[in-house]
């Protein structure tokens, strides 16, 4: 019978002597990253650890891990005052057993909240609905997490505010100062954890991306001027293989500006959407790898960048999109480094080359 102990032991063996299951003579990504003083990792769910082959692949390639859902408030506090840490604890145990760091994601977000939270926040007489949760969650993992996405996706230009902030329950209840409150609380709760602001939209080459980059710089600059302890920017890195793509010049300039603020940079949720693509797998895989390479070659050329995490390691757990095209063609997304059989794809090799060429 496969037990948790046997999975962990097997994964360690996989690290010491990589099997022929896709390992070959190529270095694991964690080794390529570590050679350049960086981390490589991915998001995972605790249920995936029951898949022994996946656990081997994860232990082989990753030296940093982030829970995909199991540190979001919807999962952690499904009803008021009732907390479930089981999934995050399992992932942390796996990370510790395999010499990995673990990230926390995410403390304050407009989404993935339990249904009861909106009413509680809007009617809260004080700030404890925000601060108590941060203190409890970060306190539980104090000294055991590399970094936290404290505030996630606070910017939303379509809401039309001069400061660019998203109109969400936290803004409605506390005003813009909810950002300050969250980071100051987080710094007190775990002074050793790197505090990250995480968002998407800074990567692309369209006109709205230009506006989003400008708004992000304005947001960060204003927060730092107020002595808000934001210490790093998380670039989610969700790309589209058949969209406009990355403008490398603009991205490089933006990252240089972030670095000049004294912030570190992490790629936190990288994947490459291949929907709307030709059905030919080889063509899709090439396009996904090319998009990833154009992005990571710039990001890893900046010495403020400390980590790259993909939003999952393998296509094995991805779901088919809806719609007639997917139904008739059998289309399945291929947006992550390993395929459904845990074999290395061109995207995996693009990531490896980006680390090998990193500054």
Can you say where each PLM-predicted feature lies in the sequence?
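Conserved, mostly hydrophobic/aromatic
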Residues: 65, 95, 148, 233, ...
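C-terminal segment of N-terminal export signals and the immediately downstream linker at the start
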Residues: 19-43
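Short, acidic/polar
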Residues: 47-59, 130-134, 211-221, 292-295
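Acidic (Asp/Glu)-rich catalytic clusters
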Residues: 32-35, 53-62, 89-101, 140-142, ...
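Substrate-binding cleft and catalytic face of glycoside hydrolase catalytic domains
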Residues: 66-69, 76, 87-202, 274
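Aromatic-rich peripheral "rim/lid" segments of glycoside hydrolase catalytic domains that contact
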Residues: 149, 153-159, 164-172, 250-257, ...
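Glycoside hydrolase catalytic-domain groove-lining segments
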Residues: 173-181, 190-194, 214-218, 222-278, ...
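N-terminal secretory signal peptides and thylakoid transit peptides that target proteins
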Residues: 1-15
């Amino acid at each position: 019978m496969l037990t948790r102990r046997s999975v962990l032991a097997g994964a360690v063996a996989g690290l010491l002597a990589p099997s022929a299951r896709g390992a070959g003579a190529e270095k694991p990504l964690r080794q390529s990253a570590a050679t350049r003083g960086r981390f490589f990792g991915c998001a995972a769910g605790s249920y995936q650890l029951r898949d022994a082959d996946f656990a081997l692949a994860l232990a082989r390639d990753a030296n940093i891990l982030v829970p995909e859902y199991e540190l979001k408030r919807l999962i952690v506090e499904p009803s008021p005052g009732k907390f479930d840490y089981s999934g995050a604890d399992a992932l942390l145990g796996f990370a510790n057993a395999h010499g990995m760091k673990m990230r926390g994601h995410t403390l304050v977000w407009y989404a993935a909240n339990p249904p009861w939270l909106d009413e509680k926040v809007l009617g809260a007489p004080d700030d404890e609905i925000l601060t108590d949760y941060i203190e409890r969650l970060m306190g539980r993992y104090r000294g055991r997490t590399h970094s936290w996405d404290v505030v996630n996706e606070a910017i939303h230009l379509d809401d039309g505010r001069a400061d660019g902030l998203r109109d969400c329950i936290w803004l409605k209840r506390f005003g813009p100062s909810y950002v300050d409150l969250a980071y100051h609380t987080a710094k007190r709760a775990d002074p050793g954890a790197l505090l990250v602001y995480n968002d998407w939209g800074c990567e692309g080459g369209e006109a709205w991306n230009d506006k989003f980059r400008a708004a992000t710089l304005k947001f960060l600059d204003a927060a730092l001027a107020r002595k808000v302890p934001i210490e790093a920017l998380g670039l989610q890195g969700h790309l589209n293989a058949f969209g406009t793509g990355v403008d490398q010049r603009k991205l490089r300039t933006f990252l240089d500006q972030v670095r000049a603020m004294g912030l570190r940079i992490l790629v936190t949720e990288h994947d490459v959407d291949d929907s709307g693509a030709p059905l030919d797998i080889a063509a899709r895989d090439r396009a996904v790898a090319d998009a990833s390479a154009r992005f990571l070659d710039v990001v890893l050329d900046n010495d403020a960048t400390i980590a790259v995490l993909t939003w999952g390691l393998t296509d094995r757990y991805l779901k088919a999109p809806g719609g007639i095209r997917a139904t008739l063609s059998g289309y399945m997304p291929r947006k992550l480094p390993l395929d459904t059989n845990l074999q290395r794809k061109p995207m995996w090799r693009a990531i490896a080359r980006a680390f090998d060429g990193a500054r």
